[in-house]
């Protein structure tokens, strides 16, 4: 992009297409490696720096394509520059419009690792899956696996545009939207109406190899017309919300660590079984 066009750049959110797979994957890998907590988790899930290899990137893209042929509730969006069409950011989410049986929700582990590496990785990923099961079980909701902005396009409203797109889906579907944030992205989500749940996930320093335990902020945003908290919604069994006749729904004008890791697990597992 020419320097003179930067100020007039407007992020546009569109559905990602098959030719976008590599570009979208490159965005979230770049974003992942640029964030401290995300980078830490990568070294656990993919020890030895394999995520940097071209073979891994190609296999991941192939696994993503295979997964797209069978996924019926997971959607990938791209955020592009309205002048050049460059992919600046991406979002990935499960939009669960129907209740799901236990078989569909089962956590299958980390099949490409063995021994202590697998045990360690599943100590990180397992609690994320368990918490989502605890909070929602088979209830209808939106789960954000990833919102990521390429480091070259930060501070241009890309992350905000993607979050606003998600909020719009939340309002239009009438479903709560749930995500695992990171300490660095949590303030933006709070500013945009997400609340931190009282439930906690704390990764132990012994597992992470860090000097201190790290807490994963769990966040939810309710539809704007729900007028109840998430705890109240959960206590009432996730009721349908009556939409006002003239609902004012916002039209849409980084990285989420836990969800993105779980998404990579699904893709690699799909590739291994293809």
Q: Where do the protein language model's features map onto the residues?
A:
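Hydrophobic beta-strand residues of extracellular immunoglobulin-like
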Residues: 75-78, 217
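Conserved active-site alpha-helix within GNAT-family acetyltransferase domains
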Residues: 160, 172-174, 183-203
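Conserved acetyl-CoA-binding loop-helix of GNAT-fold acetyltransferases
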Residues: 146-149, 155-168
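Hydrophobic adenine-recognition pocket in adenosine-nucleotide-binding enzymes
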Residues: 16, 147-149, 185
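Conserved GNAT acetyl-CoA-binding A-motif
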Residues: 140-142, 169-182
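A short beta-loop-alpha structural element at the N-terminal edge
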Residues: 12-26, 32-39
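Conserved acyl-donor/pantetheine-binding loop and adjacent beta-alpha core of acyl/acetyltransferases
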Residues: 39, 51, 55, 67-73, ...
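Conserved GNAT-fold acetyl-CoA-binding loop/helix
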Residues: 35-63
């Amino acid at each position: 992009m020419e320097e003179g066009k930067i100020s007039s750049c407007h992020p546009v959110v569109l559905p990602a297409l098959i030719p976008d797979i590599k570009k979208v994957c490159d965005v979230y890998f770049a974003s992942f490696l640029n964030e401290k907590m995300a980078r830490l988790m990568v070294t656990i899930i993919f020890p030895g720096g394999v995520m940097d290899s071209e073979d891994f990137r190609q296999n991941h893209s192939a696994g993503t394509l295979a997964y797209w042929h069978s996924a019926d509730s997971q959607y990938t969006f791209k955020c592009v520059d309205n002048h050049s069409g460059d992919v600046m950011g991406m979002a990935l989410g499960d939009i669960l419009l129907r209740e799901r049986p236990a078989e569909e929700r089962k956590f299958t582990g980390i099949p490409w690792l063995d021994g202590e590496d697998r045990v360690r990785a599943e100590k990180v990923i397992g609690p994320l899956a368990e918490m989502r099961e605890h909070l929602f079980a088979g209830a209808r909701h939106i789960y954000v696996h990833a919102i990521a902005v390429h480091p070259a396009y930060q501070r241009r409203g890309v992350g905000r545009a993607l979050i606003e797109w998600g909020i719009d889906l939340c309002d239009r579907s009438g479903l709560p939207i749930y995500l695992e944030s990171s300490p660095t992205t949590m303030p933006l989500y709070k500013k945009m109406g997400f609340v931190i749940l009282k439930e906690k996930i704390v990764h132990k320093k012994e597992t992470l190899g860090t000097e201190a335990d790290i807490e994963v902020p769990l966040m939810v945003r309710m539809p704007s017309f729900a007028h109840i908290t998430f705890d109240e919604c959960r206590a009432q069994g996730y009721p349908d919300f009556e939409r006002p006749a003239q609902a004012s729904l916002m039209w849409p004008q980084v990285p989420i660590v836990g969800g993105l890791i779980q998404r990579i697990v699904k893709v690699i597992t799909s590739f291994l079984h293809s």
